[in-house]
A protein has these predicted regions:
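Positively charged n-region of N-terminal signal peptides that target proteins for export
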Residues: 1-4
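Hydrophobic h-region of N-terminal signal peptides that target proteins for export
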Residues: 7-17
Length: 156
């Protein structure tokens, strides 16, 4: 019976849960152009549609989207991994079907438009946001701000 003990301990070691994975670092630092895209396209989008739940007053999921540094840091799950859109949890949630439980913005909020999603994807991918796409995303963000100001919130 004694010879089976090392085998049993080895099996337990492989079956034990592994330590949580460390959050991956961005592939490379942001360029000045990427920082500019963030400031003119992405941050206004977040300010209009995300910061009320992910900002200084409220940090759902321990995620803040009110600054570039906070956005890149992420929350419980990493928000963005620049250069690796498939590893970016927030991006995945933005592209979920509107009926999915984890969709962002939540179902009861105004969804991001396709142009906003495309701009966000380009940013996370590490690519410059093309001018026409940036203009369309900015226009959609302005519409979302107007809608948020004029649409009454349902009482909870």
């Amino acid at each position: 019976m004694r010879p089976l003990l090392p085998l049993f301990l080895a099996a337990c070691a492989f079956a034990a849960p592994t330590a949580p994975k460390k959050k991956p670092e961005p592939v490379k630092p942001l360029t000045p152009a990427q920082k500019s895209d963030y400031a003119k396209v992405v941050q206004p989008m977040f300010d209009a549609q995300c910061v009320s739940c992910h900002g200084p007053k409220k940090e759902k999921g321990k995620l803040r989207l009110d600054t570039l540094e906070a956005t890149l840091k992420g929350g419980k799950n990493l928000a963005f991994v620049i250069g690796r859109p498939n590893d970016s949890m927030l991006l995945a949630r933005v592209f979920l079907d509107r009926t999915a439980g984890d969709v962002m913005p939540p179902k009861e909020e105004h969804p991001l438009t396709e142009k906003q999603k495309e701009a966000l994807y380009a940013f996370v991918e590490g690519q410059p946001i093309p001018d026409e796409l940036a203009k369309a995303a900015i226009a959609d963000t302005r519409k979302a701000l107007t809608a948020a100001k004029t649409t009454p919130k349902p009482k909870k």
